[in-house]
Amino acid sequence: MTRTDRLCVGAIAGAFGVKGEVRLKSFCAEPSDIASYGPLFTEDGGRSFRVTLTRPVAGALGARLSGVATKEEADALRGVQLYADRDRLPSLGDDEFYHADLIGLEVRDTGGALLGRVHAVHNHGAGDILEVTGAGRREALLLPFTRAVVPTVDLSIGRIVADPPEGLE
């Protein structure tokens, strides 16, 4: 399993005000930490930005990005995802994972049967949910990402062992 050198840490939600500020949606555990992981890059690496947080705004952070001086420039960046170099991010503890490292992992049940692969990781406020697809499934399998349901994550071999609650299989 190969690791990506950059991880998505946020996205630009649009312009904020008329002086080139942006509404920045942070995907970091502590939202304001996004500014300390810079420079941040576009997905293709074609642009980089230094981030200066200005104020909290509803559901996001107000921020200035280097090289963005007008509302029009800020508007043009709406929807752009921002990536940080992995080595700028904090070290993770045992049993902590970046979502990007889970996506694509093979998922097997405790008996060894293939359940599919992690397609996405969702969090709607109550904890992470793994979306597992493939292995002949017509619908995605949604697994709570808890130790009880996912007792083993082995990044070195690209595998998760899951023990889905009865009825979820």
Curated annotation (Swiss-Prot):
Keywords: Chaperone, Cytoplasm, Ribosome biogenesis, rRNA processing. One of its GO terms (molecular function) is ribosome binding. Residues 94-168 form the PRC barrel domain. It is found in: Cytoplasm. HAMAP family: Ribosome_mat_RimM. The PRC barrel domain binds ribosomal protein uS19. NCBIfam families: 16S_RimM. Belongs to the RimM family. This is Ribosome maturation factor RimM. The gene is rimM.
